[in-house]
């Protein structure tokens, strides 16, 4: 499980309302000490905790937005730009009293999030434009464009360890294939429990997750190496080149050779 860390020295002693919005991928949320749930695209986590110094992203990919409101400063002085939109200190404080909450964005909320995300990614907007877009998003979220949802399947630290160690075992060498029975036996649990833990962390069944990982590896090798299709098939976990070609075509819409030709051409043009 990939982990991203960064210094957060400014956030140690203050009182915050933290809004985390998942745009793509998955992000781990510690719902309570030792209990974890996972954000997926279009979900929001609201908490009274200060920003963390690191986050875990199952699958190694995550895109999202984190908005942090300093409630101590807002209690001393609430800007008119916020109160004009109905964001009083009392309204914000009410959200912190609910603890760690998961919510699902409505279509309007998703549109506001996508707008701010696009502005941040493109990097052409002024700080004032970004502030306005962030304020608009906060107003939508607190104004009703995020609906509280059940947190779904939560897992313990030990259950998370089983899922992440199994993922590492399966992805370290894609040429090796493991059955659910082999994996569950290795960790001393039932097959149904293993599947539950893995899906809770990675958001999809083992078979789908590994198929996507194999195709990612194949695409990388096709675009960056001169290895033969047969060699790439083996490196991706397929003993038979024909089965590999069929699986690759189902995934990408083109044959391995066509994918290599198209991506080599794109690389040369760049």
What positions do the PLM features span?
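Short hydrophobic/aromatic patch on the recognition helix
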Residues: 193-194, 198, 243-244, 248
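Aromatic (often tryptophan-rich) hydrophobic motifs at membrane interfaces
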Residues: 189, 193-194, 208-211
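Terminal helix-turn-helix DNA-binding modules in bacterial transcription factors
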Residues: 164-182, 199-241, 261-270
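Conserved hydrophobic/aromatic pocket- or pore-lining residues that grip, position, or stack substrates
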Residues: 130, 170, 194
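Short, conserved beta-strand element in jelly-roll/cupin
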Residues: 12-28, 67-69
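Aromatic- and Gly/Pro-rich donor/ligand-binding loops
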Residues: 2-4, 23
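A short beta-loop-beta micro-motif enriched in histidine and acidic residues
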Residues: 4-18, 60-62
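Alpha-helical bundle regulatory/interaction domains
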Residues: 28-158, 163, 180, 185-191, ...
């Amino acid at each position: 499980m990939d982990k991203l860390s960064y210094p957060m020295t400014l956030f140690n002693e203050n009182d915050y309302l933290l809004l985390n919005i998942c745009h793509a991928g998955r992000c781990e949320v510690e719902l309570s000490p030792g209990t974890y749930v996972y954000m997926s695209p279009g979900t929001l986590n609201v908490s009274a905790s200060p920003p963390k110094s690191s986050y875990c992203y199952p699958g190694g990919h995550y895109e999202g937005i984190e908005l942090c409101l300093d409630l101590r400063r807002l209690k001393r002085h609430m800007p008119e730009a916020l109160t004009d939109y109905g964001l009083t200190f009392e309204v914000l404080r009410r959200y912190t009293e609910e603890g760690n909450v998961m919510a699902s964005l409505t279509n309007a909320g998703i549109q506001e999030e996508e707008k701010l995300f696009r502005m941040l990614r493109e990097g052409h907007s002024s700080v004032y434009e970004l502030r306005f877009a962030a304020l608009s998003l906060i107003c939508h979220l607190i104004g009703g464009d995020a609906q509280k949802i059940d947190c779904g399947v939560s897992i313990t630290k030990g259950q998370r360890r089983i899922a992440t160690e199994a993922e590492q075992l399966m992805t370290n060498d894609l040429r090796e294939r493991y059955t659910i029975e082999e994996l569950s036996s290795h960790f001393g649990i039932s097959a149904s429990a293993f599947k539950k833990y893995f899906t809770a962390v990675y958001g999809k069944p083992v078979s789908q997750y590994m198929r996507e990982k194999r195709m990612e590896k194949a695409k990388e090798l096709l675009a960056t190496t001169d290895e033969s299709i047969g060699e790439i098939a083996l490196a991706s976990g397929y003993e038979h080149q024909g089965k590999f070609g069929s699986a690759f075509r189902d995934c990408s819409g083109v044959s391995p050779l066509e994918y290599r030709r198209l991506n080599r051409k794109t690389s040369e043009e760049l």
